[in-house]
Amino acid sequence: MGYTSYSSFSRSVRAASAGYATKSASDIFTQSKERKIHESMEPSKALLRESRDSDAHPNSIPIIIALDTTGSMLDIPMHLVREGLPKMVGNIIQKGFPDPQILFLGVGDHECDRAPLQVGQFESGDEELDLWLTRTYLERGGGGNGGESYLLAHYFAANHTVMDCLEKRGQKGILVTIGDEAGLHSLPKRSIQEIMGKEVQGSYSDDNL
């Protein structure tokens, strides 16, 4: 993944055609109407995500954007799809990272939600990034347990990604978690296994991630 390039012009034309500026969240993020995670973003089917160099992007830098999909955070995905994502990609390139590869994660609450983790792909192209962003299920869940499962983003980044920037250049990738709650401090082994569909060695917490 990540072999195409970002075109602000083509993105602008496509956004106008798709009606991003005027449509509602449920019309843009269509999984909200389905009320379920898109099968391509099931974490049990995303046991490894790769960020690789290519002729088009010889110095790839992986960037994970973890979006809180609970009820209070609806405005962030809407801002990204309407204007924030093109500006963000442009700013990243202007700051000296010409080959960004962005992966969207949806993060909720593993104690309450049906889809506490959703996983896209590392992409560079405007069309592909829009696809994964708008495919995210805005579950609008969460509970009164004092936090959300932002640790799931950290767990996935640490255990289920491979990247040429690290293997070839010793450079770490970037993880950005966007939320408005405290993070739950632990991920029980049983919860991780249920979400990822595989055996894991143990629980995870703030201290060992």
Predicted regions mapped to residue ranges:
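Acidic, low-complexity intrinsically disordered regions
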Residues: 1-209
